[in-house]
Regions:
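Beta-propeller blade termini and top-face loops
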Residues: 21-741
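Sec/Tat signal peptide C-region and signal peptidase I cleavage site
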Residues: 16-20
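Bacterial N-terminal signal peptides that target proteins for export
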Residues: 1-7
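Ser/Thr-rich, Pro/Gly/Ala-heavy low-complexity intrinsically disordered linkers and tails
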Residues: 747-750
Length: 751
């Protein structure tokens, strides 16, 4: 989601000290963040994107959640005010979860099947595609079924020894609990055409009956199997098929089967918006067109379930379990009242009472005449004008009849979903699934601040607590902290996407807010106005408290006064995302500047010099590090290699060594240099954090620390004052490691 809100906080006084005493990674949170982009939910809790939920068929306290990049979690007290979640898959090779379902043929409901997929709203970034994950002990342990490795698993069904998976390559089926799979799509005997198979639906009452949507190729449509997926028959009619083939085809199709055998289908068109919802009483023709839910905003402008046009990722559907006429649909975000009207401004409330860009969900009643079928499931359609986070991903009905919904903010519950009397509650509890793409440490007050995908910019409320507070909502920017100039005060910079509402705040050592300014970014010396990147890299200066570098879309800008005024110093564009390849200032030289643009390395020696290109790396530069006491020592990483220079970046030697061959870390993401008698270079990747020493030529690598899940570590920061390594992960929030420089910080493997 790309909408936002700025929040003014009453900041709490800190408790002193936040230092780990061993080589164990420590999770800081968020778990959850407060003041997020939800409405009339206690504390306005958000945690991060959850792609799939599985509700226990008979026990409303048991709920599983598959986070987009945070692994599988389980709660045994889902009906509590603050459910307690347990992480289950941290040691697996990927935490990118696409789907999870119970096996209805297991009478004890101990068997679950899940699949890996990359579905992050951050460009679908994610970890390895391992295949399927299966548990037979209520999630306590999981087996990786690798026969479908490297496939996006978009739907799963477990029926004893029979496993069925809908993937980007079609439908696969196993009859031996996943040891081997057969591709059914495109095989004449199966009845399924070749093409991407999106979603897989069934019902516990008739476990042998399955439905799948084929969403690419020439045979798009809805197909039904009555023999647990062995053979399939097209059941969609000409109208439904035509919709799925309209334009460039459906971007997404979701299915849900009710207890009476009724089937609902939701189709997203090639514009990323819900194009149609259909119902069949028994899974065969005829299919009744239920239209699409809409609200009327200013000047009669109509908006459906996807004002943001993000239906390719954000769509959910669930049939009601007791009323065969009811269906629930989730889209992306609320529209503001004047959206689509030139010059109207983006103001709330909208027509249903939404005051923010929160969740957009509806209830459909097929027994009603056209024009009366759809009712909001949020705001005016609730008893308390509540709404979950935007960008819905999955739905399930729990054993008590509540609607459980997952989205880019976490997991939420709608009580009494069949009426307007209920409301939305947070089930996030201590779930930690925040996707940080930027992170910074404040050594003065011992706080972390991070920019996250869709849950905004958040910061630690108090050391020792997992609760964070939202600074701004929407998509977080690249936060940075200046904490070197003083031991009693610090300055934090933060924004939302496109450097929106860049904020400069100063804090004392007790985390008390002492100033609050929106810098003007006024161009000087004939510089053009700054044009931000979606994710705009920032860098504070190592040697000067008020200097700032901004990596804009139209060049590199320098500020000498904290962003009040800016000067363009280069037209090159700093590479955005991941490690932010920019170093600004070294010991005794505030004018030093080094940055990466594509595969090219640019440098300014000091304030008297100009920016020039000095080298080209083998691929796009992901991150840079410099020994600030000796600027001739420079490090650079690409996605697959590590490089070392001893002449200030003019020439590099590859020091990747055994990092890739021994540890298979996946894509390299970020790095940090740690000075000392035997300096360390630390590199973060899709799977783990690794370290090499100067005494070994920075080319012999080891795993750093223990206890870190196999999550994408998106950004690293080393704080020399606290001797602390901070890791921002894409799916598990913020982590720290105290660097004691003892031998126990090195591990030979993951724990």
């Amino acid at each position: 989601m790309q909408t936002h809100r700025i929040i003014t906080l009453a900041l709490l006084i800190a408790t002193p000290g936040l230092h780990a005493q061993s080589a164990q990674w420590e999770a800081l949170g968020p778990g959850p963040s407060h003041s997020g982009q939800v409405e009339n939910i206690a504390n306005r809790e958000v945690v991060g994107a959850v792609n799939s939920v599985a509700a226990h068929p008979t026990n409303p306290d048991v709920l599983f959640a598959g986070a987009v990049n945070g692994g599988i979690w389980r709660t045994l007290n889902a009906t509590a005010t603050a459910p307690n979640w347990t992480r289950l898959t941290d040691s697996l090779g990927s935490l990118s979860i696409g789907s999870i379902e119970f096996d209805p043929t297991d009478p004890q409901f101990q068997t679950l099947l899940a699949g890996n997929a990359r579905s992050s709203s951050l460009g679908r970034d994610g970890g390895a595609l391992l295949g399927l994950l299966r548990s037979t002990d209520n999630g306590a342990s999981w087996s990786v079924l690798s026969a479908l490795a490297n496939r996006e698993i978009l739907g799963v069904a477990a029926r004893g020894d029979i496993l069925v998976a809908a993937t980007d390559g079609g439908v696969y089926r196993s009859t031996n609990t996943g040891n081997t799979f057969s591709l059914l799509s495109g095989e004449a005997s199966s009845g399924l055409p070749a093409g991407t198979s999106m979603d897989l639906a069934g019902h516990a009452g008739t476990p042998s009956v399955l439905y799948v949507a084929v969403t690419s190729g020439s045979g798009r449509g809805i197909f039904r199997s009555a023999d647990s997926g062995e053979t399939w028959t097209r059941v969609s009619d000409a109208t439904l098929d035509a919709l799925m083939n309209a334009g460039s085809g459906t971007r997404r199709t979701e299915l849900s089967v009710g207890a009476a055998g009724q089937v609902f289908v939701a189709v997203v068109g090639d514009n990323g918006r819900l194009a149609g919802v259909f119902r069949s009483a028994d899974g065969n023709a005829p299919w009744v067109d239920l239209g699409v839910p809409q609200t009327t905003e200013q000047n009669g402008v109509l908006f459906g379930a996807h004002p943001g046009g993000q239906g390719s990722i954000h769509l959910s559907i669930s049939a009601d379990l007791t009323n065969p006429q009811l269906v629930y649909i989730g889209g992306d975000r609320q529209p503001y009242f004047g959206e689509g009207v030139s010059g109207s401004g983006n103001y709330f409330p909208n027509s249903i009472g939404a005051h923010d860009y929160s969740g957009r969900l509806f209830r459909g009643d097929a027994s009603q005449p056209p024009g009366s079928i759809w009712t909001p499931l949020t705001h005016s359609g609730t008893g308390n004008s509540s709404s979950p986070h935007a960008d819905s991903r999955d739905m399930a009905i729990d054993a008590a009849g509540n609607l459980v919904e997952s989205d880019d903010g976490g997991v939420y519950k709608r009580t009494q979903p069949a009426s307007t009397a209920g409301g939305w509650l947070s089930l996030n509890g201590n779930l930690q699934s925040t996707e940080y793409h930027g992170i910074a440490w404040d050594a003065v007050s011992n706080r972390v601040i991070g920019g996250a995908q869709d849950t905004g910019t958040t910061e630690l409320r108090s050391p020792g607590s997992p609760i964070f507070d939202s600074v701004s909502t929407g998509d977080g920017g690249d936060p940075v902290v200046e904490d070197r100039a003083s031991t009693t005060s610090s300055t934090r910079y933060s924004s939302y996407q496109y450097l929106g509402a860049l904020l400069r705040r100063s804090f004392n050592a007790s985390n008390g807010l002492t100033s609050f300014v929106y810098p003007n970014l006024s161009p000087l010396n004939g510089s053009p106005a700054l044009q931000a990147q979606f994710y705009t890299p920032l860098a504070v200066n190592h040697a000067s408290a008020t200097r700032l570098i901004i990596g804009a879309n139209n060049g590199v800008y320098e500020s000498l006064d904290g962003g009040d005024t800016i000067t363009q110093v280069s037209t090159a564009k700093i590479n955005a995302f991941n490690g932010d390849p920019v170093v600004y200032g070294v010991d005794g030289n505030a004018g030093y500047l080094l940055f990466g643009a594509a595969s090219n390395l640019f440098k300014r020696i000091d304030d008297a010099a100009s920016v020039t290109q000095i080298a080209t790396l083998p691929a796009s530069i992901v991150d840079l590090s410099v020994d600030t006491s000796n600027a001739n020592t420079v490090f650079a990483i690409t996605q697959t290699s590590v490089h070392h220079s001893i002449d200030g970046g003019a020439n590099f030697t590859a020091v990747t060594g055994d990092l890739i061959s021994t540890f298979a870390p996946g894509r390299l993401r970020s790095m940090a240099f740690v000075p000392g008698s035997d300096p360390m270079l630390i590199v973060a990747a899709n799977r783990g954090v690794y370290v090499a020493r100067a005494s070994n030529g920075y080319s012999q690598w080891s795993v750093l620390g223990s206890g870190l899940p196999n999550v994408i570590v998106y950004e690293l920061e080393y704080d020399q004052t606290d001797e602390l390594l901070l890791a921002g992960t894409l799916g598990r929030g913020a982590w720290t490691l105290a660097l004691s420089f003892g031998p126990d910080i090195f591990k030979d493997g993951f724990e």
